[in-house]
């Protein structure tokens, strides 16, 4: 996973901004999260988001717009408890965000295929403060974390 993230970061840094500001800009965004749940259990998440930014004004420069980001995320979350085996979940969610914050709804899936609803909220740009609520059957669990993401515009990478 580290090799793939390093490669994606290198690709993203290799291509600069081409000055074009299309209405839709598809992107791919790898991310890594570290955090604690309300019981002080450490967790780590690795994810990949596919999405698009939408320019919601007719301004010429992207910086003069209020872009909206829509995305679909797929990831893995691991919980590390003392003297217990690591518990792994797959997850997916759909999210909407503006530049400095957003929300998402989705599901965690355990190794037996059971699903649990997950709501997530974040603030920040490439470094995010996160808050998740996971609904494990009758129990709601709160998660707090730090997330690093690196959005890469697909068309600028491919056609630059």
Question: Where are the predicted features?
Answer:
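Sec-dependent N-terminal signal peptides
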Residues: 4-13
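Outer-membrane beta-barrel "beta-signal"
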Residues: 46-50, 141-160
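Short glycine/proline- and aromatic-enriched beta-strand/turn motifs that initiate or cap beta-hairpins
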Residues: 17-67
């Amino acid at each position: 996973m580290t090799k793939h993230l390093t490669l994606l970061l290198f690709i993203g840094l290799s291509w600069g901004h081409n000055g074009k500001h299309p209405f839709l800009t598809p992107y791919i965004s790898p991310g890594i999260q570290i955090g604690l749940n309300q019981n002080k259990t450490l967790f780590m998440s690795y994810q990949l988001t596919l999405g698009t930014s939408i320019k919601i004004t007719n301004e010429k420069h992207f910086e003069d717009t209020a872009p909206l980001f829509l995305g679909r995320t797929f990831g893995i979350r691991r919980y590390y408890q003392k003297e217990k085996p690591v518990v792994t979940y797959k997850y997916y969610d759909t999210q909407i965000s503006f530049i400095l914050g957003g929300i998402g709804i989705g599901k965690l899936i355990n190794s037996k295929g059971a699903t649990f609803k997950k709501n997530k909220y974040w603030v920040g740009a490439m470094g995010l403060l996160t808050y998740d609520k996971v609904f494990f059957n009758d129990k709601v669990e709160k998660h707090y974390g730090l997330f690093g993401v690196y959005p890469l515009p697909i068309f600028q990478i491919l056609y630059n």
